[in-house]
Design a protein with these regions (language model features):
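Conserved HGGG/HGGXW glycine-rich cap/lid loop of the alpha/beta-hydrolase fold
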Residues: 1-42
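Glycine-rich His-Gly loop
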Residues: 8-11, 77, 167
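A short beta-to-alpha transition loop/helix N-cap that caps and shapes the active-site region
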Residues: 42, 102-113
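Conserved acidic catalytic loop of the alpha/beta-hydrolase fold
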Residues: 53-71
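Conserved hydrolase catalytic core segment
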Residues: 69-107
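The alpha/beta-hydrolase serine catalytic core
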Residues: 112-153, 157
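Short beta-strand/loop motif that positions the catalytic acidic residue
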Residues: 158, 164-166
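Conserved alpha/beta-hydrolase "acid-adjacent" motif
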Residues: 171-176
Length: 176
């Protein structure tokens, strides 16, 4: 579509296809851009460590490459976490934020959800040196076990108008 840019950021272990059913709707009013995060979808992993901070820097490089000077950002789950890091690091590029299921730190996730992730991470990490699949799983699960690392003070420094979406059955703690 045309109009003000809207970046759609998917969650961990997903791709731009997460937003497939919403692209047509948003494209009526916005220039919609839905990138795949490093190591997800069609974007190669590259070298070095995967982190939310690195994904935010990748997003900066991506919007600069496209010539986007400012955009609204809708982030789901880790996409919301990336959006927060991006807004803190590159505030001049952010119009408005929509954070759906984002969290500030790993303890913000309900224990009933986080515990199986932690167990899976430990198992995958144990086998990571013997299996490329286990290594990839350990990296992806590691993002959910170890990140993001933001504080309430960090969140208060986000200057863009922000809509936070949380559902009744959300995996993020209401108090978070």
């Amino acid at each position: 579509g045309s109009g003000f840019p809207l970046l759609l950021l998917h969650g961990n272990g997903e791709s731009h296809e997460y937003f497939a059913s919403q692209l047509e709707y948003f494209s009526v009013h916005y220039r919609v851009v839905a990138p795949d995060t490093r190591g997800h979808g069609r974007t190669p992993r590259g070298d070095g460590e995967l982190s939310i901070s690195r994904f935010a820097d990748d997003l900066h490089d991506f919007v600069m490459m496209l010539g986007i000077e400012k955009a609204n950002i809708l982030g789901f789950s880790d996409g919301g976490n990336i959006a927060m890091y991006f807004a803190l690091r590159y505030p001049e590029y952010v119009g408005k934020l929509i954070l759906n299921g984002a969290n500030l730190f790993p303890r913000g996730v309900k224990r009933s959800v986080q515990l199986p992730i932690e167990v899976g991470y430990r198992i995958a990490s144990h086998f990571a040196k013997k299996s490329d699949d286990a290594l990839k799983n350990a990296e992806i699960l590691g993002l959910m076990v170890n990140e993001p690392r933001l504080t309430a003070e960090d969140a208060s420094r986000i200057k863009a108008p922000t809509l936070v979406i949380a559902g009744t059955h959300d995996m993020i703690k209401r108090s978070h």
